[in-house]
Swiss-Prot record:
InterPro entries: C-N_Hydrolase, C-N_Hydrolase_sf, Gln-dep_NAD_synthase, NAD/GMP_synthase, NAD_synthase, Rossmann-like_a/b/a_fold. One of its GO terms (biological process) is NAD biosynthetic process via the salvage pathway. It comes from the Eukaryota. It catalyses: deamido-NAD(+) + L-glutamine + ATP + H2O = L-glutamate + AMP + diphosphate + NAD(+) + H(+). GO terms for cellular component: cytoplasm. The keyword Secreted does not apply. This is Glutamine-dependent NAD(+) synthetase. GO terms for molecular function: ATP binding; glutaminase activity; NAD+ synthase (glutamine-hydrolyzing) activity. It comes from Drosophila melanogaster (Fruit fly). The keyword NAD applies. SUPFAM superfamilies: Adenine nucleotide alpha hydrolases-like, Carbon-nitrogen hydrolase.
Amino acid sequence: MGRKVTVAVSTLNQWALDFEGNMVRILQSILEAKDMGASYRTGPELEVCGYSCEDHFREPDTFLHSWEVLLEVMMSPMCENMLVDVGMPVMHRNVAYNCRVAFFNRQILLIRPKMAMCDDGNYRESRWFTAWTKALQTEEYVLPRMIAQHTGQQTVPFGDAVIATRDTCLGYEICEELWNVRSKHIEMSLAGVELIVNSSGSYMELRKAHITSDLIRNASFKAGGAYLFSNLRGCDGQRVYFNGCSAIALNGEILARSQQFALQDVEVTLATIDLEEIRAYRVSLRSRCTAAASAAEYPRIHCDFEMSTHSDIFKTSTPPLNWPMHTPEEEIALGPACWLWDYLRRSGQGGFFLPLSGGVDSSSSATIVHSMCRQIVQAVQQGDAQVLHDIRQLLADSDYTPDNAAGLCNRLLVTCYMGSVNSSKETRRRAAQLANQLGSYHIEISIDSAVNALLSIFNAVTGLTPRFRTQGGCARQNLALQNMQSRIRMVLAYIFAQLTLWVRNRPGGLLVLGSANVDESLRGYLTKYDCSSADINPIGGISKMDLRRFLTYAKDKFNLPVLESIIDAPPTAELEPLQENGELQQTDEADMGMTYAELSQFGRLRKQSFCGPYSMFCHLVATWKSDLSPKEVAEKVKHFFLCYAINRHKMTVLTPSVHAESYSPDDNRFDHRPFLYRPNWSWQFKAIDDEAEKLQPIYTPSSAQLRPSSEDLLISTQRSSHLDDSKHSSPLSSASASASIDVGISTAAVPLPGAAAPGGLSKKPSGYSKVHVNVLGKIKDRTGIPV
């Protein structure tokens, strides 16, 4: 009997309900694993039908076609003399389960259902599947007749069991079970299971890849053994990007791993493991041996198969490797680009159309497309036949072979500067320079004639002509004129997206790309149905601060020097008239009444730390104590929640974007909230004001901690007593917390600091009046609600 086994984990780019394509990729992974000498192959979660079938999991067809694919795979000669398992949905006694189906030589050994559902973040598994709760138990599963006719089996074990070969034993966890507080791998390892297999559907979030590697290491470190982790990769039809990182670990060290980001549809990762290393490691852990001696016994399904052979002794065991992690800037460059590629090739469209303003956001979207082109060229040069086939099909050119990113970008990306009389020469110049350096097909248009045409219609009906604020108009007129420009750009974007390839004598149309970042979506700083309304958005899950860092990285990595001037330029929508000298008088942060750094912090506290208005104030009054007084913090928090509430409706029509940030306000699934709020948050804001009133007398900005004097404490106590006397009366009856929305943002006459330079806290004594007139005036007109 041998002592070394070669095992394979598969990273697959599957597509929901693409049963034919999914089967081909599964068979390809099995063939590659077998050719490389593996005796066992596993794959990702629900690889047969695709993970993101969602409510299609309620359709009998999905189960039927999954069994049909399993039959084709199981009967394939590729699988002979190899232990294989695949992921698919299985209905058992009228309950749907997410399962692994293990088979050997055309015989099903075990159907192992998932025992812990994931309902966090973008996951909603309990909507479609039920967790198997009968620990260490199996039941008889009656096979479909079409399967029984080929295998000769009528029933197979279904439940929580492990598979014992002649030389070792393997057991299963499925995705969430690794993250679960009661992970099954500990129980299995104590029961003598040496190879623990996890099929997963884990998606990308910035700065989170290390969590998976840490969990895999720890799973094999605590009680010894080999851990085989197989994950999906790519966009299979939803907003997430499954981020690969399949890996094999042994006794706390990573032996092999797949790429996190790649265009490969199939990547097989192997490791050769010495089983005696597992046994020696485990027996050396005395506390583990004590626990194992009294561990419950797992049901074992016996398989008459040796995963190792005597000749395997000549094989070299796979040594440990270092797992370097991508920086967040690299993750932005690679992840959304791969997601765009999957979406583009599976949508049947001919490329992208991007309104390019010359600012950070649209420049980031354009740079991500350029990164996609670089990856395509690299994959083709490395001999990836599937990528070459796909790009030729997209471009309707069977002889084309991309040899440089700029040339490919010229075919795939159309950028358009949509200027107006309010646009500056600087943004026009930056957009043109970036397009030239990227290689995109660039056009410039003016929207002024369209604006004038719409205004003439309005004037013909009403006899009135709205004016900008700088021209004597009110805030309502000013906002209407800005929104009209934005919406005209959206209409023009779709016209050019549909017809540009016709102009270029190519078939098909273009996907419109959006460029609204996660912070502006959270704040609602975008016009509903403007250029933020697109087919897809590569940066919708990324913060402004991260985009700036990404462009700094891309400037050198992709040789795009113009990005430096784009990063340094103040963010602006350019929707209001320029000053007489041609310079800007409108900036985003002044319009919003908060900096992007503050907005990012608000977003993380709201989503990641589950803070409502009062909890957020309590957190920030300590975090910002060296810069802002309690009352100033209170005004900022209230301003954010007011803006969030009255703009929440915009999230219901937000353009689909790749999920990347853990505080995303994506309404589709990740962030479920009402879209009709009471915008003045009367009860919550009164709680903030009361607390700020207590803290203000003892506030010392230069202190590391609040150190109230005896006199301050006495005054604070007296004030608290006064407030306590009235605490039983409804705060709605007080002047500072009126039920009427007319109370505005503030319930205390404290100036709100204005905007500072990007990336810092804002603190200007005269800022509140500017925010109140400029920002709240726009909010009032945008929603029709007086605030």
